[in-house]
Every structure is written in structure tokens, then in C-alpha cells.
Amino acid sequence: MSDTYLTIQDKSEGIYTEKRSKFLAFAHPVETIDEIKDLLTDYKKKYYDARHVCYAYMLGPERTDFRANDDGEPSSTAGKPILGQINSRELTNILVVVIRYFGGVKLGTSGLIVAYREAAAEALSAATVIERTIEETVTFTFPYVMMNSVMRVVKELTPRIVEQKYDETCIITLAIKRSMAPMLEERLNKLAFE
């Protein structure tokens, strides 16, 4: 289980032309299905005159939520090659949309696969890939007299303090790399028995 994942920093674009058909590709960093739906709606409105608006997305640090859509192209000739480019770069939290303007010459199954793959590759090559840290939050409630001990653990393990409330009973919420969360919880819970 990794503490990081790869995604892109900002929107990027690419273009691929084959036998007068033009393939416009756009890659977006995304976090939710709703965000993806909104972007797809926008693209379908903006490029209403395009023959096809095909896409693929990958969501989540574990890369388990994904979809590929051919939007009327022959089965597996558009969405799958786009998704293949996302997979080959091991990216997640990403949407890649490829819009096709038909140029009058049929490309055939293999031609479509190559065109959608290359258009997606162009957009992804133009993107800045970044590494994000996967964090878990830990909330700990303790009496004020334990403050020094708690802060010593915080200093040693260096979690990010998300929220803190200090009174007779204190509450602190910490964010830490996923792999370190069990150790942080264990160290804080041990303090209660000192």
C-alpha cells in the first residue's frame, strides 16, 4: 500500500490528425464523478458539432474506479485506448476527453485505436505529472495535563495539525501519511496508560 499516487497538476491539451479527421484531446485533474459529469456536459455543449466525444477516467489512490466510453465509435476503439494511456502512466484522479471531427475518410478499427491512443498521449505528454501524498486523519481526545506528552509525539512523527481545541479536555485532529497512521494512533493511545 503506497503513500502516494500520480496525477496531473492542471488541464493539458493535445491534437492528432489522421486522414483529415481531427482529434482534440483534453486531460483534467479531477476528484469526483460529479466533476467528471460537469466537464463532459461542458465539452458536449462546446463541441456540439463534433462527431464523437469519447473519454476515459481513473479515480482514487488505489486506481479502482474507472470507465472508458466510446460514444458511438466501434466498441473498444476509443475509450479503451484512452484508458490505456492513463494506465501506462499510472495516473489517477484524471479525465481524458478526446473529441473527433470526422474528415470524410473512414479510419477502420485499427486506425481509430491508433488515433485515439495518440491523441490521448499528446494531451498527457503536455501535462505536468505530480505526486500526491495519501493522508489519514487521527482524532485524539485527552486531558490537558497530557499536553506535553501529546505534543512530543506530534513533534516526533510530524503529522499535520488539522484542528485543535485546548480546554480541560483537549481534542486534536492530525493528518499523516497513510502508512504512519497506525503508529500515530498506537503512540497516542499508549499515552493514556502512562
Enumerate the language-model features and the residues they cover.
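Terminal, non-globular segments
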Residues: 174, 180-183
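A common structural junction motif
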Residues: 47-50, 157-162, 189-194
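Long, charge-dense
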Residues: 117-135
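Conserved mixed alpha/beta catalytic, RNA-binding, or beta-rich assembly cores of soluble enzyme
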Residues: 75-88, 112-116
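Short glycine-/aliphatic-rich beta-strand segments at the starts of folded cytosolic domains
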Residues: 129-144, 172-174
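Short amphipathic alpha-helix segments
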Residues: 141-158
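Glycine- and acidic-rich phosphate- and metal-coordinating loops
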Residues: 92-102
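C-terminal regulatory domains involved in ligand/effector binding and gene-expression control
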Residues: 1-77, 163, 181
